[in-house]
Amino acid sequence: MVDKHEEITLPIVLSCNYQSDITYPGQKQFDCGNPVIDKFVRASLKKSVRNSDCAAKALIDRQSGELIGICTFTAYSLEKQRVSGVLQGSQPSEIGVVRLVMLGVARKYQKRGFGQDLLCDFFEHVKIIHRALPIKGVYLDADPAAINFYTRLGFVQLSARPNVFGALPMFLAIQHILAA
């Protein structure tokens, strides 16, 4: 019989820059429940980071070294019409942003706040980027199942219609990130 009051022991995790020269335990079996993210993490992440196609933050179990979560991002630009009504004042025709490409936490670690922890670390990285090269915010294409998660973090939908892959474009202005 299981004691309902038994404490669940959460792993002690380390959020760090993903290193393409390391083989992380669990990476080849990574399963966050999203087939696109799973396939990318298992087969393409290492090469994409090595080739500077993206940067990545990793969430690692300190004890086992297991890859718990991943967040990939890259420089990007949006046409100002895409963010009309979201940004104040006059804007150039193209605005610089950081694009959050993929965010995934292994299923067995989901619903424990690790995705939010990984995003908070990502936002700290975005602040550093902004100090070196000012940007207007963070852009992402949200899987429909993740829209509420991103909305709770302050992201707004840029379109009511999903793209051809079923994802909705969302945006978080840099002011919100800097204020956090």
Predicted region positions:
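Non-catalytic substrate-recognition and accessory regions of acyl/acetyltransferase enzymes
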Residues: 1-112, 117-139, 143, 147-180
